[in-house]
């Protein structure tokens, strides 16, 4: 029959490879249209062409449990059991991300714990987005590294129960597996090595102590006169400007504000000052103008005598 496993197929985990998929899901796959039309008579070489046509990842969806093409091709690969080299090429394919995810799922189902860690962990560096169809038939976005993390740590992926996987630290203790080195650590090592090289270059460029002494001696010498270009940029002092009047453009003379020297204003100001100084003293209550007009008879006699003496 078309649904039987090939005769020369090896048992996987002590059982028929197709039995890794649950019976109810397996029967739904056999009854699906995609299985009957697209998966009939496929070989290991033709599976690659069908895998390149995949548009999303998923298990079963809907109320009547319809399988996705991704799950149908997974069961077909379990049935024909392609060689390990073909699966490794699936995983290493960088052009088609769904071909890579299909090979990763098949390796997780059929490979040993050492092979799973060896071939799947490098895919942690693949950050491309893939479409995933959930049980409700809706599409979600996921990254390839997330899908690989589910394969290595979860019990069920794409509605398929995954075989038990041995812990990584156990394989490291038995020296079956080397400690994992992440791509981030490699980048950090590259950055540190580049920084060390830059430090060495800077040390090589550092001048010797004799050069420092020369620089210190040079500080005592008189400074060189600035270049003509630097001279032009300097702003001239007012002395230099006064020395070179020819270069300056003749400007109109400035109008200075002269104080008015009229005798009337001068007299009025002097009178105001006297009035202020006398008003500050407590004994004087009369105004300056009243004192100037009202003179005593004694003062008038004295002034008259002085005028007569001057005439004589």
UniProtKB/Swiss-Prot annotation:
Annotated Basic residues bias: 224-294, 301-312
Compositional bias of kind Basic and acidic residues: 202-223
Family indicated by similarity: Belongs to the PRP38 family.
Keyword Calcium carried by entry: no
Gene Ontology biological process: mRNA splicing, via spliceosome
Organism in which the protein naturally occurs: Xenopus tropicalis (Western clawed frog)
Subunit structure: Component of the spliceosome B complex.
Transmembrane segments: none
Aminoacyl-tRNA synthetase in keyword set: no
Protein role: Involved in pre-mRNA splicing as a component of the spliceosome.
Pfam families cross-referenced by the UniProt entry: PRP38
UniProt keywords, alphabetically: mRNA processing, mRNA splicing, Nucleus, Spliceosome
InterPro entries: PRP38 (IPR005037)
Official protein name in the record: Pre-mRNA-splicing factor 38A
Subcellular location: Nucleus
Cross-referenced PANTHER family: PRE-MRNA-SPLICING FACTOR 38A-RELATED
Ranges of biased composition (kind: Acidic residues): 184-201
Gene Ontology CC annotations of this record: nucleus; U2-type precatalytic spliceosome
């Amino acid at each position: 029959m078309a649904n039987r496993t090939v005769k020369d197929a090896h048992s996987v985990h002590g059982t028929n490879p197709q039995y890794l998929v649950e019976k109810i899901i397996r029967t739904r796959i056999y009854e699906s249209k995609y299985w009957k039309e697209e998966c009939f008579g496929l070989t290991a070489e033709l599976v690659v062409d069908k895998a390149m046509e995949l548009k999303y990842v998923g298990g079963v969806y809907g109320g009547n449990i319809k399988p996705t093409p991704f799950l149908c091709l997974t069961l077909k690969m379990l049935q024909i059991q392609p060689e390990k080299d073909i699966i490794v090429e699936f995983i290493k394919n960088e052009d088609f991300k769904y071909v890579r995810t299909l090979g990763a799922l098949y390796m997780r189902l059929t490979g040993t714990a050492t092979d799973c860690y060896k071939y799947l962990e490098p895919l942690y560096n693949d950050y491309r987005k893939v479409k995933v169809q959930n049980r409700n038939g809706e599409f979600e976005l996921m990254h390839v590294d997330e899908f690989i993390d589910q394969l290595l740590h979860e019990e069920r992926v794409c509605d398929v129960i995954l075989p038990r996987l041995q812990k990584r630290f156990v394989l490291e203790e038995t020296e079956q597996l080397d400690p994992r080195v992440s791509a981030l650590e490699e980048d950090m090592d590259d950055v540190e090595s580049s920084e060390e090289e830059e430090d060495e270059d800077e040390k090589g460029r550092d001048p010797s102590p004799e050069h420092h002494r020369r620089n210190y001696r040079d500080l005592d010498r008189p400074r060189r006169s600035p270049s003509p270009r630097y001279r032009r940029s300097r702003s001239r002092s007012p002395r230099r400007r006064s020395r070179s009047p020819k270069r300056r453009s003749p400007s109109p003379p400035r109008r200075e504000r002269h104080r008015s020297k009229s005798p009337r204003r001068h007299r009025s100001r002097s009178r105001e000052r006297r009035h202020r100084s006398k008003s500050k003293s407590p004994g004087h209550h009369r105004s300056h103008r009243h004192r100037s007009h009202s003179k005593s008879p004694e003062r008038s006699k004295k002034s008259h005598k002085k005028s007569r003496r001057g005439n004589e």
